[in-house]
Amino acid sequence: MEKIRKRLSRREMLTAIAAGAGGLIGAKMAYAAPERYKPVQLENGQYTQSWFLNSFLELPDDFEEAKSNGKRFAILWEQDGCPYCRETHLTNLAIPKISDYIRSNFDILQLDIWGGKGIVDFDGKGMTEKTLAKRSQVRFTPTIQFFPDAFSSATPLVGKKAEVARMPGYFRPFHFLTMFEYVRARGYQHAPFHQYLGKKVSGLKATGKEIPKW
């Protein structure tokens, strides 16, 4: 927690505390879900999912594996003591519709922004998780980096420039799912996320459907 205090403003800390309180509600909803949607709690208290990538931490290989399986590759950045990360696991990923969609369409690699594990970036350069986070300009958690379905020779393969989209912080379940749909549909080729989201909301309203209140 000391690292978090040093890097968060007073306003951000208050927001984090509020999110933690809200997470108690999310936890109740999550654990009402079937067993297969419950997260795995690690010894350090952090959460993960049984279906996240079991990786050798070589990004080119993880990317190619996802591609060969017809999926998109994404990195989920977390850190110890992060209330929004907890909410992501106990609420968002505990909703069957969301979990099933992501599992079917994405390979997710979970990393720690302060982690010391060795990892190989897309350009073949080795470094720690912490260094990769800095290289990718990841400063807050949770952050999700989404990558293209294929790299061309003109595509920069390092840092933030390698992404096609980014989820910069905690998104509520409806927005969370929509972001994954946006990436899967290559919506980033046509419009920014907020426009894609707006069209989805308008479409639901036009057909008399309510926005899910997860």
Each language-model region and where it sits:
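Short active-site neighborhood of thiol/selenol oxidoreductases, capturing the structured segment around
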Residues: 69-82
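N-terminal secretory signal peptides
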Residues: 1-8, 16-23
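Thiol-based oxidoreductase modules, predominantly thioredoxin-like and allied folds used
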Residues: 99-127
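Structural micro-motif
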Residues: 129-147
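A short beta-strand-turn-helix
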Residues: 55-71
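Typically the conserved alpha-helix immediately C-terminal to a functionally engaged Cys/Sec
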Residues: 86-101
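Non-catalytic, surface beta->alpha helical segment in thiol-disulfide oxidoreductase systems
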Residues: 139-140, 147-188
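N-proximal helix/coil linker or "cap" segments that precede and/or mark the start of modular domains
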Residues: 33-52, 205
